[in-house]
Amino acid sequence: MGEAAELICTLCKQFYHLNWCTGTGGGISIRERNGESDVAYIAPSGVQKELMRPEDLFVMDLIKGDYLSIPRGLKPSACTPLFLACYKKRNSGAVIHTHSQNAVMCSLLFDKEFKISNIEQIKAMPNHGYYDTLTIPIIENMAHEDELIDQLNDVLDKYSQDTVAVIVRRHGIFVWGPSIEKCKIYNEAIDYLLELALKMHQYNIPLP
């Protein structure tokens, strides 16, 4: 299946042990572009992420919109339309979706946006420095993940290219980036900042 498929399985296992992708939740998609080829590898629905194998992945031709590989007995991720929207509207190279408890908790404390500034880790985000304010939009959860598409499209249309994530209230977070390496960095940095914000709230420290 290739390097992208192996990497998705490796990362899903790592994310499982971080409690980001437990109980079959969450998913990852990686895009591979080579000449005229434009292909996405997508983690399936309902598979324990720590046990996932490369042959479990769906492979889609992004130019034609057709599946090149459909694993037997598995269902496509309900996140697929959301992954595709990030590829189309942000020219992303990868998308990570987790059920991070830090994201869920922050979604209960903040209204329409999560904001934080004057924290060193913000430098990990694109075009952000120590004094800049990181803003992550928060959208409302729906019964099915594919029903989030309209809200996600609104975020992708209204927010700047420097916005690389959206929190889904009571659900988790989607993070995208130009490559899986960058996407992973953004995801880790954001989760750090979300956790820090929760601790600051616990100790009544105002967010800068």
From Swiss-Prot:
Q: Where does substrate bind?
A: 79
Q: In which pathway does it act?
A: Amino-acid biosynthesis; L-methionine biosynthesis via salvage pathway; L-methionine from S-methyl-5-thio-alpha-D-ribose 1-phosphate: step 2/6
- Cofactor requirements of the protein: Zn(2+)
Keyword Flavoprotein in the entry? The reply is no
Binding locations of Zn(2+): 97, 99, 171
Task: Give the chief site where it resides.
Answer: cytoplasm
Q: Quick one: a GO cellular component term?
A: cytoplasm
Reaction catalyzed: 5-(methylsulfanyl)-D-ribulose 1-phosphate = 5-methylsulfanyl-2,3-dioxopentyl phosphate + H2O
SUPFAM superfamilies with a match to the protein in the record: AraD/HMP-PK domain-like
Kindly give the Pfam families that the UniProt entry links to this protein: Aldolase_II (PF00596)
Q: What does the record note about the cofactor?
A: Binds 1 zinc ion per subunit.
User: Sorted alphabetically, which Gene3D superfamilies does this protein's record hold?
Assistant: Class II aldolase/adducin N-terminal domain
Please state where this protein is localized.
Cytoplasm
Query: Where, by residue number, is the active site?
Result: 120 (proton donor/acceptor)
Q: Which UniProt keywords apply?
A: Amino-acid biosynthesis, Cytoplasm, Lyase, Metal-binding, Methionine biosynthesis, Zinc
InterPro entries documented for this protein: Aldolase_II/adducin_N, Aldolase_II/adducin_N_sf, MethylthioRu-1-P_deHdtase_MtnB, Salvage_MtnB_euk
User: What does the record give as the function of this protein?
Assistant: Catalyzes the dehydration of methylthioribulose-1-phosphate (MTRu-1-P) into 2,3-diketo-5-methylthiopentyl-1-phosphate (DK-MTP-1-P).
Name the family: Belongs to the aldolase class II family. MtnB subfamily.
Q: Which NCBIfam families match?
A: salvage_mtnB
Annotated protein name in UniProt? Methylthioribulose-1-phosphate dehydratase
Q: Which organism is it from?
A: Candida glabrata (strain ATCC 2001 / BCRC 20586 / JCM 3761 / NBRC 0622 / NRRL Y-65 / CBS 138) (Yeast)
Its gene is MDE1
